[in-house]
Amino acid sequence: MKTIVPNWNVPPHIQAFTTTREGGVSLPPFESFNLGDHVEDDKSAVKTNRTLLVEKFNLPHFPLFLTQTHSTRVITLPYEGNDLEADAVYTNQPNQVCLVMTADCLPVLFTNKQGTEVAAAHAGWRGLCDGVLEETVKCFQSAPEEIIAWFGPAIGPNAFQVGKEVIEQFMAFDPIAETAFRPDPNEVGKYLGNLYQIATQRLNKLGITQIYGGEHCTFTEKESFFSY
């Protein structure tokens, strides 16, 4: 089972990783380590993969799987409620697992320097635009300069194609977002966007400057990652 471990400078007791599509039991086109039950994969295969996740990485308990809707809602763990529609998870308690699922969307992991607060956010372009990262950071008691972030694999700046309306939505929040887009040389009227750059801009505006990751492209590395 292949994973990617963040290249960030955090306390050793903070365990973080992102899985790839290798090492599970799902059949094509979901081969093989698909953890999402919202796609048309066999439910028993997804259940097996989730069990493998817990066993392989010695997780302290079965993690909470969110119903992700490109929202800005953050759930704080431990959570006893039934409403799982959210796109980020935060905790300041030990032995909690913050988990989000992504394909082309951007996964962002957070911790403070002391390793007493952690979070994970699912940032598709809609959630990123609407403020899911900002809402996640609001949960932290630590000051922004004490927070460290890592960008997991997402669709890269040479593959994320959008229309002018998407750029305008980002610019409505902050005009600097325009610098994260460039005309697509292969299609008139379309643009290529850099989710990593936009997320960096958003976090920098909050005062978070210790940011790692952002070197993968799920669209071009389809052997390793799921992509639409």
Where do the protein language model's features map onto the residues?
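Active-site microenvironment for binding and transforming phosphate-containing groups
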Residues: M1-Y228
